[in-house]
């Protein structure tokens, strides 16, 4: 990420897409760009007198883990992911915030850190704050995985849906696991961009084309994250 300790503050928001850094910046004052190297774009700004670092991590657990490790190295204490998810239950609409109370580690990266039995859970403190700030969000267990376009996506999603999981992404499991190992408080706040049983490509198209519900959901997830860090 090419940041120095002098660039850091204790609170950070990570996003996948470098373009989403601009969306977070709309909520900040006195922000300034820091670095842009590979998928890692960063800026620092102020939200209600609280300084926040914003960093993009690209797609997937490996690059997210690099970002988390390097944020830890420069002194960051709290990291909230603001990202996208696909729902795993009917009735979760586009733009609904999904907040993970834990994650199934269905990725390869975290298995390099800890045994499969090791749980991936967020900070109970940050989670409790989120429940106060956003009681309307959908809370539950999510799944973090490594691939979008698997031949057995439908069967895999149905399998995990039957266990009550609410959504899936690619980075939250890594955030919870690496964050826990490094003593960082973490939380993942996700904007639902694919309804359960909907075609993945249709959901991606909604995100890219700017579906109103998806846009409003993105704004709401950013707002929740900033309010949690400010509380």
Model-derived segments and their meaning:
Residues 31-36, 136-141, 231:
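Flexible, glycine/charged-enriched surface loops at secondary-structure junctions
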Residues 119-167:
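Active-site rim beta-loop-alpha module in soluble metabolic enzymes
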Residues 154-160, 166-197:
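A C-terminal functional module that forms or caps the active site or interfaces directly
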Residues 198-231:
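His/Asp/Glu-rich mid-to-C-terminal helical/loop segments that flank catalytic regions of hydrolases
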Residues 88-90, 106-108, 148-153, 197-198:
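Short acidic/glycine-rich loop or secondary-structure boundary segments that cap or lie
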Residues 129-136, 178, 224-231:
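Generic non-transmembrane alpha-helical segments
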Residues 96-100, 186, 205-207:
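Short, hinge-like loop/turn segments at secondary-structure boundaries
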Residues 1-128:
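Metabolite-binding pocket within alpha/beta catalytic cores that recognizes anionic/polar moieties
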